[in-house]
From Swiss-Prot:
Chain positions of site Important for bifunctional activity: G119, Y120
Pfam families: DCD
Protein's name in the database: dCTP deaminase, dUMP-forming
Transmembrane segment boundaries: none
Upper classification of the organism: Bacteria, Pseudomonadati, Dictyoglomota, Dictyoglomia, Dictyoglomales
Amino acid sequence: MILSDKDIKKYLEERKLVIHPIDDPQKQIQPSSVDLRLGNSFLHFKVEGRAYIDPTKDNPQDLMEIIEIEEGKPFFLRPGEFVLGTTIETVKLPDDLVARVDGRSSLGRLGIIVHATAGYVDPGFCGQITLELSNINRVPVALYPGMRICQISFYKLTSPAETPYYKKAGSKYHNQKGPTASKLNIDFCVKEDK
């Protein structure tokens, strides 16, 4: 079951669901979702001179540089470019809700993709949402910090998760702040017995 605006407001009022800050509820709360806004930090891959990325050997965090954009200034996403962005809002899900992040239609019509694959948010997650931004247009597109960039919708589980994200061993992105690079390399770390 997808939550309606009425149910979203109820979850927010009862603090079961936290989205902070929501500066303009009239604009941000939609009939069955909440619009989230673009933060001012981006992670950009430093790929010059690299033939490929090997997640079993490379630490993606070492391959990225942070770009900070001043308020009111645009970030130009070039054709074919891929960067990580973040939402301004921090989202905290209760143990009985799953969330789905999707791009806004208006940006999709400009060729902006908001997430490559990771649109699913587990019950019990808390943190800012990392956005996997790319431009499939043939011209650069200006993105402004503070603009509504994506929408998050909420699905009620049949029962609360037995092991929500914050209790799950290996929850790599819990309490993330800002754009967060891939931690896939952790999956390949082998602990040796001594």
